[in-house]
Amino acid sequence: MSNHHAVVKTQAELAELFAQDLTCGVGRSVKHDSAAKHVSGEAQYIDDRLEFPNQLHLYARMSDRAHARILSIDTAPCYAFDGVRIAITHEDVPGLKDIGPLMPGDPLLAIDTVQFVGQVVLAVAARDLETARKAAMAAVIEYEDLEPVLDVVEAFRNKHFVLDSHTHQRGDSAGALATAKHRIQGTLHIGGQEHFYLETQISSVMPTEDGGMIVYCSTQNPTEVQKLVAEVLDVSMNKIVVDMRRMGGGFGGKETQAASPACLCAVVARLTGQPTKMRLPRVEDMLMTGKRHPFYIEYDVGFDDTGRLHGINLELAGNCGCSPDLSNSIVDRAMFHADNSYYLGDATVNGHRCKTNTASNTAYRGFGGPQGMVAIEEVMDAIARHLGLDPLAVRKVNYYGKTERNVTHYYQTVEHNMLEEMTAELEASSQYAERREAIRLYNAHSPILKKGLALTPVKFGISFTASFLNQAGALIHIYTDGSIHLNHGGTEMGQGLNTKVAQVVAEVFQVDIDRVQITATNTDKVPNTSPTAASSGADLNGKAAQNAAETIKQRLVEFASRKYDVSEADVEFHNGHVRVRDQILTFESLIQQAYFAQVSLSSTGFYKTPKIFYDRSQARGRPFYYFAFGAACCEVIVDTLTGEYKMLRTDILHDVGASLNPAIDIGQVEGGFIQGMGWLTMEELVWNNKGKLMTNGPASYKIPAVADMPLDLRVKLVENRKNPEDTVFHSKAVGEPPFMLGIASWCAIKDAVASVGEYRHQPRIDAPATPERVLWGCEQMRQLQAAKAVEAETEMASL
């Protein structure tokens, strides 16, 4: 029989332990709580769970038409397959038939028409997935084809929108453009991006005895899944519990898109009384779900001899797909970030929500911000080529100031501006000036291989643009042995959120992080959660957990003060111990004393972000609590005969405030940069003329591999610079801002191609800059050079 009695330590021994620093609190590089499980395969995902007895497997039959009227659906052939339990259409949904997250437009099962190739028309549940698939494909669906809209430019020109356009305006941009010394116009196409999470969309639903459901779902938004499942079943939300331990990746793709499998499973489970599971194969996942919004950009800019902007008109046309989904907020954020780090002067920024017959596009890391930033970075490069200046010089002359030229085009003051200092530090550490000169010399003597260099900044606003989402809850229990149980409303998708929130709680109580146990996110423990998105996971949930921990800690301080007849200031927590004036207790002994004194050792916590507001009718406000800053310097080499390129070196300096966990934050910066680089260089989505996505698997859709990383990648976090706002331990969000660092790679490729034209012409290279587009850009430069040579010869001949 084991001995559970702890060894009693002397006061001297306790004092020595008390004096030591906590090794796993805030600011420490604590290992990700599931790191070992991830690499060993022990981490449990939904598909790893033991199957329930009598569990059904669900397969969705998707539309093969981009736009058509449904004339008839015959599911009778489905039942010819042994093992089929049920086939459902929209007529079988007991409650609400539309699962649009904020407004209607997303029927769970197609009703009268189909709007894109991949829309779910019917679903079949059977004893195994293969039987369900064969049966679903046997159903007979008759269509009458309708004319689809597949091109975002066509939708933009014809004002074919899912929602009304929105405008940010400051000053008289038309007047500024008319009087500017220099004026250029241009267009740009920015491609979308597949989330390509390792774990595809999946849900498993278990009916309960009281008519409710337990939903195991890979989702960034458990409360929304809970709400929508309740609505399609026509029951109250308290009948539905959503359980989410971890996702195998999300990137925004499981913010709204996870609801469809969960709701389909719930309908089948309600109709059959049997547990039901749906896991999308990769091809079906890519066809059925939305992507990052592609954008079409038109710009008209006026500027002076230094490249400083005087006026700008920007048209941002987002391809929203067939329904609103989150597009209103996504296009808004593109507009909010169409300045990136630059004072635009007199500005008009129009955001358009274009409707096409493709899958409804959705949230993706950056949430529209990257597309807005790419637009203005294209403008900066175009100005530099027009004037024959270094693009970095043009960028710096347009930076926001600290006391003037410091208000955005939506009237938020840019506070705590770090752009100049960070750029200067990165310029020096990356040896930008020396390398710029060396690259110009190299290119002058290298006719085929050309090098490019770019240094681009990032200023990214942190907060949900939908203000009501800026709230979070948490629940903490302390047990009598001193162990701590933590639940919060955030979801873990590999980004280390659970580790960071556990560090926050460990820091408050000054205990080892091993004492803190985090379990699955459950809607019956922390209700009304916001999605884990907008880089807000640690900001919101960390603050809520801190609030809950501080509440319990204050009770303990008050108890110790009364019990030992000391002031509250005499009670100090440190390194797993509590000093009460001259006496030192272990943390667990104080907990036991408090329990016997009937002190509550449990608390909820809550947090809402202060200061933020946005008046949409006036198009002005403070939509962001603060800005996160960053800068990246990329060097690339391009083969101008093939368009192929290689990233040679990348230097990154990124601002995370007082880092909660430097190791995790550096990992997020590295991963964000690579994902952003992939979006702008190789990740190309291609649809055929019938509206079918052809790049629908890893064989045709290319994401960055190890070999695509820069040969030399150097990442540094800004040191000794706390977030001046009252965030969790004065940290800053790190999920999305590093993604935009990848813009430097695209700009470096354009810089290399521009060297073919002696840096005086802006190459037309839409994003992603695939080798084909890079080659076209090189040919464009060669043709311009050839035309210039002919013009020079003609002029000489005329003399």
Region spans (language model):
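Flexible, low-hydrophobicity surface segments
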Residues: 1-165, 183-186, 271
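C-terminal catalytic domains of large/alpha subunits in multi-subunit enzymes
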Residues: 4-7, 90-91, 234-239, 269-276, ...
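Glycine-rich loop/linker segments at domain edges
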Residues: 28, 33-41, 166-203, 294-379, ...
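Extended active-site and interfacial segments that coordinate phosphate-rich ligands
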Residues: 33-37, 58, 137-144, 150, ...
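Short beta-strand elements
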Residues: 43, 202-207, 296-305, 311-316, ...
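Phosphate/diphosphate-binding loops
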Residues: 127, 274-320, 543-572, 576
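Helix-loop-helix junctions that connect adjacent transmembrane helices in secondary transporters/permeases
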Residues: 153-233, 399-483, 694-708, 712-716
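Thiamine diphosphate
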Residues: 248-273, 277-279, 497-505
